[in-house]
Structures are given as C-alpha cells and as structure tokens.
Amino acid sequence: MMVKMRIICFLLILPFLSCSASEEEPFVNKQDDPVDGIRIAWDYSSMQCLAPIGGYPRIKKLIDNSLIVVYDASGNGVLRRSFDGGTSWSEPVNVFKQHTYTNKDGLSTTVNIANSELIQLQNGDLVAACNFRPSKDEIAPFAIVIRRSKDLGVTWSEEQILYEGGPRFTDGCWEPSFLQLPNGDLQVYFANESPYRNSDEQEISVLTSHDNGMIWDKDIKTVSFRAGHRDGMPVAIISGNDILVSIEDNKVGQFKPYIVRNSISDNWKIPVSEDSPLRESALLKPLAENIYAGAPYLLRIPTGEILMSYQTTGQRSSNWELSTMEVSIGDKSGRNFSKATRPFDVPFDKEAKWNSLSLLDNKTVAAVASTNAFTSSVGVWMIKGHILSDVQARKNAIILDGDLSQNEWGDDFPLFVGSKGKSNIQSGICYDENNMYISVAAHPNGDLINQLSVYLDPENNCVTMPDKGIYRIDCKNNGNITLNEGDKGGWKMIDSKQITAKVKTGAQQQYTLEISIPFSVLHKIDRKPMRINLMLETSMYKESLTNSTPESTGSWMKVVF
C-alpha cells in the first residue's frame, strides 16, 4: 500500500519537475560604468636598476633633455645623469656628504643625508635639497639644506642651511620638495615637527625666495595643520591658478593621501586646517581605515591630468614597511584619483617605497622606487609607463601585407600591453568606408606569445558580460584567426571568412600583424565611438589592456572615428 501511494505522489509531481527542468533562468546583462580618459601602462621590459643600494629617488628631465636622478645612499645624497633617455647613467657623484658635527660642548655625531630633491629653475640653474639627520640626539639640529649648480651639476655651491629644527628625532624637519611659481618665486615645502615640541604633532611648512634661492624669507608659513595629527611628505605642483600639495594625513587610522590647495594669489595666507574645504581626501574610492597609503607624490602630465603615486599596504599585509608603490590618475583639478596600477610586481615579503614620478616625454612617464623586489638589497629601480588615452582612429585604407609602414600607420601606436612580463604588444587602428584595420607589433622578448585576442564592443554598449553584438578575434602567431561572438556571458565561434590577417615575421620571434575587419561583420552602420580590448597570451600568463577586464566591455578603451 505504501509503495502504491509513493508512486502516485511521484506521478502527480512529475509534470512540475519536468517543467522546472526545461525552464532556463533568463540571461540579464548589466550596464557597466565606462572607463574613459587616460591610463598608464607600465612597460616591464623597460625596468632597470639605477643603484644597487639606495633609496628615496627623484628623477628630473632637464631643458637639454638629459635626465638626473638623485637618491640617498650610504648616508650621502647622490646624483647620476643620463644623456640617452635613461638607457645608461654616469658614475654616481655625492652632492651632499655624510659628515661629523661637533657642538660647542665638544660632543660629536654623524649627520646622515636623507630626502634628496632637485629642481631646475626657470633660469636653468639646478638647486638640490636634502634633510640633515644627526644619528644622535641633543647634539646637532635636524635641518633643511640646499646647494646650487650653474653648470648643470658639474660644480656645486657651498651648502646653505634654510631651516633648523630641534636636535632630536621627535622635533625634526623632514622631506623638502621644491616648487617654482609662475612669477619666479622659489618655494621649499617640508614636514615640520619643530613648532610642536610638547606633542607628536606635525605641520607642513613653506619657505620662499624671490631671487631664485639666493636669499630666503625669514618668516616661515604654515601650509597645513591638523590638530593632534601629523601632516607629512609634501609635494607641490601648479594646476591652473592653484597650488596643489599632496600630503599624507592620519586623520583616522593609517595615513592616507590628501590634497591641500590654495590659489597662487592667496599662497597660504591662512593655513589649511583639519576642517577646511581646501583639504580633500585624494582617492575617489576611500580606503579602509586599517590600510596604509602614505608618501604621496604628484605629477601633472601634458594633457592636464594629475598622477599621484603613494606606497600602500592595500591587498598586502598590515606591515607598512612592506608596502608597495601604487599610481592613481586624477582629473585636471587634482581630484577623483582612480584607475590605480602598480608599476612593480612586489612579493608580499618585499617592499617598494619612497617613490616618485617624472615626465620623460608627452607620452611617457617614469616611476622610481626604493625596492628589494628583484634583489636582496633595497636599491633604486625605474620603470617607464606609456600614457594611453582614448584612441583616435586614423582614416586611411590599408594594404594588408603585415608591414606596418609609416605611410599607412604613421608613428603612433596608441595601445600597449606589457606590464606583467618581458613580452609586449603595441597596436594601432585605422579605418576606411568599409573596413576597420588593426595593427599589432609583437615583441616576445623570450616569452613566446601564443595568441593575441582583440575584443570589440562596436556599439559602445558597456556591459558587464559578453553577449550578442560583442566580438572576440583570436589570432595565432601564424596569422590563423577565429571569430567569436558573445553568448549569454560566454563566447560562441562564428564564421570568420570575411576577416583577413597578414603576418610579417622578424628576428627573435618578433612579428607584425595587420587585421582587416569589415564593419558589416560587426553590424556597425555608423561611426560612433566603440570599445576595444587587447590580450596577449604566453605559456605563463595572460594580460589585457591596463585597467580592463576581458568580460566587462565598459572597462575597454574607447575608440573614436
């Protein structure tokens, strides 16, 4: 009887089970926020060691197009120079030397050099700065010191002490950085504990010279101060009619990057306090209180956007000593910093700190850091970064032969992938009435590139997953291609006969590739903006365009026709 009842119950519910099994959940794609504007793509193959032992590096490009790097090493402030864009460097020269200081009571201490800095003035002179740091308390004052060179670093003036803090570590002065105003006034910004000898507080101070640093105002101005806290590590730039100073601010929890600002005309008449609207958290997405992000550095690029580097424990351990360099991109007003990248791949038990940024040319920046990521010692390492922006496609018909001739493609290949390893690709886009053309120059550099993939969102749909109307073209290094169309979050191979590709091989497994894609295949009628992503695949890793993901088309780069 029981068996019969169970059979009857099963037969009654069977239609409902069958119905449920046959019904599929409807696929719902979501809109994705578009990622527009500039990005920084770090070039792993450009990485080099500038000093096997050293720290706190700063690179400056001079008016003669040479480069100078200053850094701290073995208690000295050191300088090296490059005349070939950073490929080779001169022998190191000590601009500031470690020395012994003896006070009036006959007590002596070693004074180390720290926080080396450099600026080239509007008149061509070089001015270097550093922080005098005595190794013993109560003997010598901490100090901000400069030297001048009128012959591009061949000879240097005597040391000039601009400011002296207390003779102890808790009342010191630190981290000088320069700014020259449009009217020629030269400023030195620094972190200053000396006014707060009965507390652990610290402010940002500034000194000004009206004659290119020969004579300095006696009055020191307070730039910013948060009562009960420690504003530190100032770096100043000009943006429009404003002075922007990046600082580290420990308002709550760990240090975070902030921007304090003043108009050039106001020029710090009133200090920026903790509740001033002229003090702003720099990052678009705030970090958790327990994440450290200190030692910020600013760089304005030719298109007006402002880059900021800092050292952070984000997605690492809580030990700030093992933080790594990160670079974010702000808008032209120095706000909303986002699109973070990490120039160096630093293991969790290593560090990349006390970093800075420099502009090498209109399309290239340099990041330098003190790191032991690649050796057992902390040294000075540099890497170059390509400034990528929304792609302006070049209108030109291409003869498909795999040869990326200047007549057809020009000199500009605005897309770059190559941050993870020595292999990299550069790419450009052309078009005519009927076709879109994509060029790729592949540089395996020892890591064979097995496949290149081109991702296209022809209608700029900006969705979170691939679906109908989203395409992926896979290209082998022999020119064989397959075409895939998005399908409910995945990919489905479709006919690729109308797409053609030509490969031209070179030495050491390098090759160039041209692809012709009819607009009709992409069902693209107009020439409104679209989006593109690239991916290279080696036997060890895959890598796509910086700040992009293969699935999310809004993260791909915009192409304008």
Regions found by a protein language model. Give the residues of each.
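Sec-dependent signal peptide recognition
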Residues: 4-11
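C-terminal motif of bacterial Sec signal peptides marking the signal peptidase cleavage site
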Residues: 17-18
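Asp-box/BNR beta-propeller blade signature and adjacent active/binding-site loops
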Residues: 27-389
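Solvent-exposed strand-to-loop "edge" motifs in beta-rich extracellular domains
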Residues: 72, 441-445, 518-520
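Acidic/polar low-complexity flexible segments
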Residues: 390-403, 455-484, 519-561
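Short, well-ordered beta-strand segments enriched in hydrophobic/aromatic residues
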Residues: 402, 435-442, 511-517
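Surface-exposed, glycine/proline- and aromatic-rich loop segments on solvent-exposed faces
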Residues: 414-484, 539-540
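Glycine-aromatic-enriched beta-strand/loop faces of beta-sandwich-type recognition domains
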Residues: 467-510
